[in-house]
Amino acid sequence: MLKQINGGVCAAKGFLANGVLCGIRKNRTKRDLALIMSEVPAAAAAVYTKNLVKGAPLLVTKNNISDGVAQAVICNSGNANTCNANGVEIAEQMCQLVSDTTEIKAKDVIVASTGVIGQPLSIDPIASKIDDLVEGLGNNSDLACEAIMTTDTKKKEIAFEFDINGVTCRIGGIAKGSGMIHPNMATMLVFVTTDCAISAKMLDKAVKADVETSFNMVSVDGDTSTNDMVSVMANGLAKNELIDEEGAAFDAFCEALHGVTSYLCKMIAADGEGATKLLECTVSGAVDDINARIIAKSVICSSLFKAAMFGADANWGRVLCAIGYSGADVDVTAVDVSFESCKGRVDVCKNGAGIPFSEDEAKTVLLESEIKVVISVGNGVGKAVAWGCDLTYDYVKINGDYRT
């Protein structure tokens, strides 16, 4: 059972964090450089964007943690360090700066960047503030969380306590993501820390399995970023028996990990650029989970559906349309659709055809800030959940002048 606690990435034993302003982008006053550090080397795992254009930090991180070990994360916002001729060199220098000011090896540093693509990233502002960044390390998950934000309007962090064979463990995470959210593992960065003792092999297995039902089920605008990354460090300081195989302990860890990731997914979707509503699509009765995920993701990605939700329009035909072109193995004559919110539920489609409903009641349901579209596609065992947001005028405004 999970117990929500405070602390974010600093909730787990032995983790410190900080965030400072180093001035990567001109005329900005927000923090733009974050550091998360474990007091001891930790098992590490990560998943990355499937975009063929990858940020230099991802390439460096993938090489650094190929041995399954990391001890720190450094991340800048305001510049993606992507499509830069010297990008890898800059990312490696960021790792070396951490090493020079701590006792951590440069190869044990996870490095990440988020921001504008194709603009040179100078190491100078980062180097000028690395001492302040390290000296200020403490229980400052919120500062690190602020420092990785770009167009985000809200900080995204969470932590839980959970039990492994009678031993209390903790896990926490921070995330950024508001636009370019359509991961295939927005820009989406997620950093998770835990004091649970788990082998790098099993951690990698847990992370790769989890993203299929968490971050890969989130979409804000259908754009897959060049810099998407989800990383997890597990330092073992909870002193539970090492999890090195499948079983009850591994299942408990996976449940805790999913508690963090699913919470952050909802926060990312709700904070979509210009968004006014969090959308959740649940699918049941599919042939299998894979087909259920295809259906849920297709609906949540539909621009027409998202626009209808912005207008509180119960246009269920757009849901059926998205199901039809999804490519899923589905009998469209067996599809039922309902809309739900805190104001109630309205059934709009039965067996693939419209049914009478009150437009006024539907409008009342859809005017809320959190909307569920509930879809049943038959009697199969497959089910899935996907998250997204409505499509508004402000999304265009935000992205029309992003570089300025």
Residue ranges and their predicted role:
Residues M1-E89, Q93, S99-T404:
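A structural signal for small-residue-enriched, beta-sheet-centric alpha/beta enzyme cores
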